[in-house]
């Protein structure tokens, strides 16, 4: 996604009237790359799907906090990695 397209998407995500459509576009654009990033960490397909869903829930609830200090994709990947690590830590604590 170009920087200009990303900036337009961010503007639409911050507008209540266009937020849902913009979020659907974000999910369509980033689902596959985020899936594979999470899959490298989590390994299981089913668990990766769960973490990906949690990632998008976190993005939806936190989008108003995105300030644009980094690219949107960088912010999304950071959330995905954090969600994957949180998942692994929970799994580890359940197994102990």
Where are these regions (language model features)?
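N-terminal module of bacterial RNA polymerase sigma factors
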Residues: 1-33
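A short, glycine- and basic residue-enriched loop/turn
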Residues: 45, 49, 63-69, 73, ...
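Short alpha-helical functional segments enriched in proximate histidine and acidic residues
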Residues: 37, 41, 62, 83, ...
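Arg/Lys-rich amphipathic alpha helix in sigma70-family domain 2
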Residues: 65-67, 81-96
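Structural recognition of an alpha-helix C-terminal capping motif at a helix-to-coil junction
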Residues: 36, 50-57, 70-82
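Short, charged helix-capping/linker segments at alpha-helix termini
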Residues: 15-25, 35-54
């Amino acid at each position: 996604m170009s920087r200009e397209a990303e900036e337009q998407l961010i503007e639409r995500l911050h507008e209540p009237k266009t937020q849902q459509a913009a979020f659907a576009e974000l999910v369509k654009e980033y689902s596959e790359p985020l899936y594979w990033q999470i899959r490298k960490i989590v390994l299981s397909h089913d668990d990766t799907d769960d973490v990906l869903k949690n990632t998008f829930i976190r993005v939806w609830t936190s989008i108003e906090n995105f300030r644009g200090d980094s690219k949107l994709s960088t912010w999304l990947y950071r959330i995905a990695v954090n969600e994957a690590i949180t998942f692994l830590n929970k799994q580890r604590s359940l197994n102990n």
